[in-house]
């Protein structure tokens, strides 16, 4: 999947345009714009998480980004790389790696809230109230796997990680901590999505 800033911008612009068109065409009867606005907000929240996450982790292990994310050709041969340039690239990577996760989570929440026999739809305020919890779940899981990575508990995932530890290459404790944080972000996001869908279903059933 191409995570270029252009694609992110186009995706958000399309959703925003659809929302505006819905309001223009239907006026007060417009309803779909709320869905598009909700998706845009979910994408924005995910990107904020990704940017903050990578601003922190690029300071824990510049090696993870320089070597692991293959930024050497962009940042140049200076070791360690210029902190400012690294920070800029971390913003790009963080936003690009998370926007689609926000879109997916927002979409599954809307699907879970679609009209059905299980109960009345929840107002969008109830859906929005789940976003901080989703954010918190993701952070907790990311931090947990970050600690696991630091303690080499994730080295079994790849022989390359075992080699890093054995050769003491690229400050391996820090490198693996950042790997764990990033892995935990995706695992946490998936768990948070499951929580969101199940809680929406449960709340809809209880309202019957």
Placement of each model-derived feature along the sequence:
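Juxtamembrane non-transmembrane "cap" segments at the membrane-aqueous interface
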Residues: 64-68, 143-166
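Alpha-helical transmembrane segments of multi-pass membrane proteins
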Residues: 7, 19-22, 47-60
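Cytoplasmic juxtamembrane regions at transmembrane-helix boundaries
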Residues: 24-34, 106-134, 198-208
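Hydrophobic cores of alpha-helical transmembrane segments in multi-pass inner/ER membrane proteins
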Residues: 9-20, 99-109, 183-198
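Hydrophobic core of alpha-helical transmembrane segments in multi-pass integral membrane proteins
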Residues: 9-22, 136-147
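Hydrophobic alpha-helical transmembrane segments
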Residues: 6, 80-103, 169-192
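Perimembrane loop-to-helix junctions flanking transmembrane segments
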Residues: 64-86
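Hydrophobic alpha-helical membrane-insertion segments
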Residues: 41-55, 129-152
């Amino acid at each position: 999947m191409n995570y270029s800033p252009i694609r992110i911008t186009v995706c958000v612009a399309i959703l925003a345009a659809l929302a505006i068109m819905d309001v223009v065409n239907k006026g007060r009867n417009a309803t779909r714009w709320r869905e598009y606005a909700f998706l845009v907000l979910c994408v924005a929240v995910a990107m904020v998480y990704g940017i903050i996450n990578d601003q922190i982790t690029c300071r824990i292990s510049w090696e993870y980004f320089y070597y692991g994310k293959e930024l050497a050709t962009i940042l140049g041969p200076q070791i360690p790389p210029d902190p400012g340039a690294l920070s800029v690239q971390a913003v790009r990577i963080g936003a690009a790696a998370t926007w689609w996760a926000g879109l997916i989570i927002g979409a599954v929440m809307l699907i879970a809230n679609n009209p059905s026999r299980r109960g009345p739809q929840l107002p969008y305020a109830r859906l929005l109230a789940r976003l901080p919890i989703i954010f918190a779940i993701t952070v907790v899981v990311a931090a947990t796997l970050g600690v696991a990575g630091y303690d080499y508990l994730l080295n079994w995932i790849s022989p390359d990680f075992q080699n890093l530890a054995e050769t003491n290459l690229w400050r391996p404790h820090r490198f693996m901590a950042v790997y764990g944080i990033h892995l935990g972000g995706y695992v946490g996001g998936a768990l948070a999505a499951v929580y969101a869908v199940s809680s929406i279903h449960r709340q809809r059933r209880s309202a019957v």
